[in-house]
Amino acid sequence: MSTLPERVRERRPLVHAITNCVTMEWVARGLLAAGARPVMARDAAEAPVVAAAADALVLNLGTWSPGLQQAMLEAGQVAARRGIPVVLDPVGAGGTETRTRAALELLERVRVTAVRGNAGEILALAGRDGLVRGVDGPDGRPGPQTERAARAVARRFGCLVAVTGATDLVTDGRRTLAVRAGHPLMSQVPGTGCLATALVAAALAAGTGAGPAGRDRPMEDVDVVAEALLWAGWAGEQAASAASGPGTFAAAFLDRLALRGPLPPGRIAPPLSERLSLYVLVSGATPPDVLEAVLQAGCRMIQFREKRLPLPAQLEAAARVREACRRHGALLVVNDRVDLALAVGADGVHLGQEDLPVAAARRILGPDAVIGATCETAGEARAARDAGADYIGAGPVYVTPSKPDAGEPYGPDVVRRVSEAADLPVVGIGGIGPGRAAPVIAAGAAGVAVISAVLGAPDPGAAARAILDEVRRAKGEVSA
């Protein structure tokens, strides 16, 4: 199977970019470096003619005007009739009502294939309050609110949605992928976002290639968009290593886009919010065949919690769990013990309010570790977020036989309380089993944490599948 950069260079798609005049030259140079052929016709009389010959169309609102809107509408309708990819960059949506209306009009009147924007722009398209700061928008990883907004836009308009930031998200409304690539210098060069949009268009025009995206699933457009963003981000990382500042970075970035070779592996994966859908807590006493059944059922988040065994036995048991998780592509976090997590090579830790502070764990484990925090109040949730937590465990939601000293249950409101206070994925825990997961998801949870409902079931694999199916239906990832 050829790589995405190779496919673009082999097929040399003609990309018609109706982009903003501030970044037009940069976008054209970037497309040429990537192996595509740019054409930048913006006039309302000319744009439909060019779109009739193009392999892909980019609609960018950066320097919007009524005349440019008309050109985009007419070119977009020609492109839609021809069935070529149309990629919208809703620059400034949410910043002014005019831009938001313009972006929505294009989505309603043109068959848009993909939208690429920052978190504030995507929130605005979903009808929610966002934050737009110039052309770059808010920093950081898209939180659950942004992810939900992206899925809503994708479902409403039948398109792909890409949210770019420190971590990029791509969704078709059901499948969602997270892309880890890029460098802070990219935000200091005007037009890197515009160029990323154009690369998405070129990638979609070049097609999906002949090979599989996974062991049992063919490549889809959502994979192609994720690869295009990885291409841009990887070029940015490589350019930064050779640059002394924004000026030299810009030249190095174009050079890196022109390089051939594979993209780095392991940078595209389901986001943490999807892995958290079913979160199972195991111990040293969990039989290996039970753990295997749970993982085969689709669980992709395991917590190892063991307080009774001596430390050497904990280490041995945790290592077995780690190996099982790796075979299935699941994440492993260790309850409380940062030292044990480091020793077995776990993906991270889960910390209670009386454990090592989140900030200290982050310093020890580094920026890529997954760190969860147990929270019951809005204040605890905000503190965990500010300290660097990746997700929150909230509960007890219901009465739980697994932890008799957990106190009175809060009901699903505990999930709503902490998820509204801190825009992090939340896992509800405590007494959750089949038939009880949907209300927790409706309250704002990304998933549910379980122990006895799965591990104590006559058929742990079937119980895990039942709860996971309930969660996915409640999240809208599968049909009810």
Swiss-Prot record:
ATP binds at R116, T164. Pathway: Cofactor biosynthesis; thiamine diphosphate biosynthesis; 4-methyl-5-(2-phosphoethyl)-thiazole from 5-(2-hydroxyethyl)-4-methylthiazole: step 1/1; Cofactor biosynthesis; thiamine diphosphate biosynthesis; thiamine phosphate from 4-amino-2-methyl-5-diphosphomethylpyrimidine and 4-methyl-5-(2-phosphoethyl)-thiazole: step 1/1. 2-[(2R,5Z)-2-carboxy-4-methylthiazol-5(2H)-ylidene]ethyl phosphate binds at T400, P401, S402, G431, I451, S452. CDD domains: THZ_kinase, TMP_TenI. One of its GO terms (biological process) is thiamine biosynthetic process. 5-(2-hydroxyethyl)-4-methylthiazole binds at M40, G191. Its cofactor is Mg(2+). InterPro entries: Aldolase_TIM, Hyethyz_kinase, Ribokinase-like, ThiamineP_synth_sf, ThiamineP_synth_TenI, TMP_synthase. Keywords: ATP-binding, Kinase, Magnesium, Metal-binding, Multifunctional enzyme, Nucleotide-binding, Thiamine biosynthesis, Transferase. Its EC number is 2.7.1.50, 2.5.1.3. Binds 1 Mg(2+) ion per subunit. It catalyses: 5-(2-hydroxyethyl)-4-methylthiazole + ATP = 4-methyl-5-(2-phosphooxyethyl)-thiazole + ADP + H(+); 2-[(2R,5Z)-2-carboxy-4-methylthiazol-5(2H)-ylidene]ethyl phosphate + 4-amino-2-methyl-5-(diphosphooxymethyl)pyrimidine + 2 H(+) = thiamine phosphate + CO2 + diphosphate; 2-(2-carboxy-4-methylthiazol-5-yl)ethyl phosphate + 4-amino-2-methyl-5-(diphosphooxymethyl)pyrimidine + 2 H(+) = thiamine phosphate + CO2 + diphosphate; 4-methyl-5-(2-phosphooxyethyl)-thiazole + 4-amino-2-methyl-5-(diphosphooxymethyl)pyrimidine + H(+) = thiamine phosphate + diphosphate. Residues 1-287 are annotated as: Hydroxyethylthiazole kinase. 4-amino-2-methyl-5-(diphosphooxymethyl)pyrimidine binds at Q303, F304, R305, E306, K307, N335, T374, K403. It is an enzyme of class 2 (transferase). The keyword Magnesium applies. It comes from the Bacteria. NCBIfam families: PRK09355.1, thiE. Condenses 4-methyl-5-(beta-hydroxyethyl)thiazole monophosphate (THZ-P) and 2-methyl-4-amino-5-hydroxymethyl pyrimidine pyrophosphate (HMP-PP) to form thiamine monophosphate (TMP). In the N-terminal section; belongs to the Thz kinase family. In the C-terminal section; belongs to the thiamine-phosphate synthase family. This is Thiamine biosynthesis bifunctional protein ThiM/ThiE. It comes from Symbiobacterium thermophilum (strain DSM 24528 / JCM 14929 / IAM 14863 / T). The gene is thiM/thiE.
